[in-house]
């Protein structure tokens, strides 16, 4: 009997799973994080924004513009058409507005076009200008009130408070070394804290003391805050002090000061806590959290019956709080109303809730705890009650009452998803539009004006376009494979507008926090400067209405202490109140705990507790990690650094032409493929009637016919092949949501990123030194690791000042053989095989020539002769871009295509490359065990097993111990056993096969029980000295392929200032020979080599031209001249006012070349090319005389080709020369 149990993943794959924990909660849809948020935006978000900004009234109150409703019309293009036409997939938005004229009572209602709103595709992406993009969710600090504490150099704890709104002015409180409290309003200079309280209308010291009670800090602060101007009351003076900080130097009155403070904090248009901010403020200042653990200094009674709830001296524990909880929510329980003076900011009574407790430090000292009362959730502004309660919390922190906040805690960080980001952007646009509307209301005639005339939609359209086009959070979708796509949609970034910047982010914010458990993956994050700032959402995490991450837990019954199937989703700050056991905790059949003492989590500690103290238990072990990390088998046996690499490598796997699912999987592959959006899913139950490569037809049970069209060989964002293949056959029964066609990198409905080669951990003639990989030629011959790459090239025919460019077959100075694959219009035919430099689209551009005379113009009009000079600007295949032409698309204005201004015709050519695995390509397993291919050996030379099976890949065993990714060893043993048994297995993360399970499985499969085998050398037939670990590991080919990186340069472009070659493949640049490389040549005394590298091959402008000339003529190369960089240095010093001259050995001044005067030294390589051409022709003529007539024909063809090359070179160098001048 084999270990494990059989699990079906979809309709087409069965695996033997080693999991022990039953999955009681299905995985949520993995792209909901995007789609649900956008749905909320359309259903509620848009209305919210309009309700925030509208109604708009003019200053005199004659006209009011109100929002009624909005609707989206049908999109102009479908998703596929948007891709093809480089358009945005969007729908026109029409808003119904109502304009009321209060003088006449007339109401005008009108539908106004508000621009196009980009729509989300079914899979959660957007198509903007033909490219698929994803809006990444942002992890930001939540609005709310935060308390901090740090120790000064004397060891005293200094506290601070920040009230952060969603938008608007910040309010900060702080203490100094003398224990005086200060306030900063909107990050200005500080004022004594009492000034803010006085500005609320509580002017006298006695009023302030009555509200806050006695405290040393408060007394010192009041002493500091002296009455400077007896002419003003204390309230008026306080208002003016704040005005002075916000607008220094401006004349101030009590009224202007009051209205400024009102507009900063109490005007909903300028200050917004948002629903989440109000929730956080209410929660932080509520007495429920603050009373726990303190002794009451007064008796609490029921306001209706007078029954004592808790007597004075009672310690408030959880049981007492259960009694008080409902009373604390009542408006008539322990509430106190304070009446401010009429001069205050808001002269209305302030109601707060107060309860007295005893201090812990001085037991007989009474402390007053003040909460902000019961402020409704829809109050988005801060209120005087909030300010009083937050000041009280701040003052009581000095007495040791209350907690300071951890800003990296996920209870204090929230997620802004697509819907909210888009809503904020729309709000910015509408706020800009509001100003325009107000202006137009005052200018235009009230009797005749319509809503349409008041509205200017440019700011709204502009802000939405700007967001999708250039925001840091709007990213080009990673479309390497379905896993990369899915991960991109679930990514959480702390960067972006309103977030952190990577330069200022410290270690704390990047580090894994205990609240990440089940919410953010502790493993998957990029290596490099963004580490820890970009995270991935955990598999089971969801986002609540406030934007906080929640993770599910199974409830443990308080009565029976047994685990129930009741699921609760908890936010990070709710979880802090509970003790939680791990999912692997042993349970009895009835749900009770096996052990008497259980290791659990409480906040950041691991605690050992008895079962009666446990509140919750994890749902499943994989809830801790992200989708990508959950695809790594034996993750628990890998070091975290390598696990991080393994997760990142899977996203870089290239889709292969014949992928296979992993023999050793985790069970996550099916859901990853299903939810990625790349698989084709059945929309209803039914039976398959027809299948071919392009479409599948399914007859539903109600007899309607669904036709599904498959994507064939489309270029993905990452220039990979996006192709769907059927996963069903005729007569199959399908169910709703079933995978009926695999996407790229999928097989049998599962994610299939690589292949299952036979791998041996052995060295082989030093070829796999330092992470190099040795492959068998079988992998090349049988196309095991072959992938298809599709690149597109565009050629635009524009209007120029000298006339329109023309797409034509008649290209000057190009031989007939270069045009053999072009059609009559000069466009390459589909199916043609093209190589570097071949013409794809023939195009000519008018050259700048003198104006034609009247006679020439007449001749031209009559005979239509080509009197005009044109130059060849054809689209050619770039270096390394050769392949087969897959498709050609032509867009013209005549056909009604939308083209960019000035473009008459656009031709797009798609070229396909079939890339086999080759030396230099990067490969990796799922455990961060990456390497590059160093040798592809013939199959007969590869080491082979006793049964004659040759090994496919040899990896260096030295790559394992120091890296500590032992998961790969367990994987090869399990893989070998699975291959021997002909089955697929699943070993879920943290709940998979143990080491004992692996060895049992290996023994049952009948292979060597130590996982090793005798290996024979393929060249000699001799066995290797030691037994070798051999098995099957899932191995991937990554996107870093040598074909994209290999590059060589002979003649190319130069930098204008330094005259040195440019760098990089894209610029056709040279190789940098840096300071350390110069030292190396100096060390070897290689003077001549060094000299030519620093002169001819770099920036000796005259010398390099003369060297080229000498090579062409076959002469000796002259001595090098002065490098251009020396001249630049001299000019730099001269520009600083230093009179610097260069002298030769005889102390005569050397004149340095001046670019503008000495244009001859900028020798044109054209002349040299022509010289080379002439010599070539002469040579050919001599050969022609000697050889026979058949060879003559051949010779002329060569000459044509040489001529075409020389002309191309001439055009190129002429352009370069012009640029450098």
From Swiss-Prot:
Can you say what this protein is called?
A: DNA-directed RNA polymerase subunit beta
Q: What is one process in the GO biological process aspect for this record?
A: DNA-templated transcription
| Source organism of this protein record | Lactobacillus delbrueckii subsp. bulgaricus (strain ATCC BAA-365 / Lb-18)
EC number, UniProt record: 2.7.7.6
Q: Which domain of life is it from?
A: Bacteria
**Which PANTHER family does the UniProt record give?**
DNA-DIRECTED RNA POLYMERASE I SUBUNIT 2
Which gene codes for it? Answer: rpoB
Q: Where is the sequence biased in composition, kind Acidic residues?
A: 1183-1215
* Assigned keywords, A-Z: DNA-directed RNA polymerase, Nucleotidyltransferase, Transcription, Transferase
Q: Where is this region: Disordered?
A: 1176-1221
Reactions it catalyzes? RNA(n) + a ribonucleoside 5'-triphosphate = RNA(n+1) + diphosphate
Q: Subunit structure of this entry? A: The RNAP catalytic core consists of 2 alpha, 1 beta, 1 beta' and 1 omega subunit. When a sigma factor is associated with the core the holoenzyme is formed, which can initiate transcription.
Which family is annotated?
Belongs to the RNA polymerase beta chain family.
Q: A GO molecular function for this record?
A: DNA binding
Q: Gene Ontology cellular component?
A: DNA-directed RNA polymerase complex
Reply yes or no: does the keyword Nucleotidyltransferase apply.
Answer: yes
Primary enzyme class:
transferase
Task of the protein: DNA-dependent RNA polymerase catalyzes the transcription of DNA into RNA using the four ribonucleoside triphosphates as substrates.
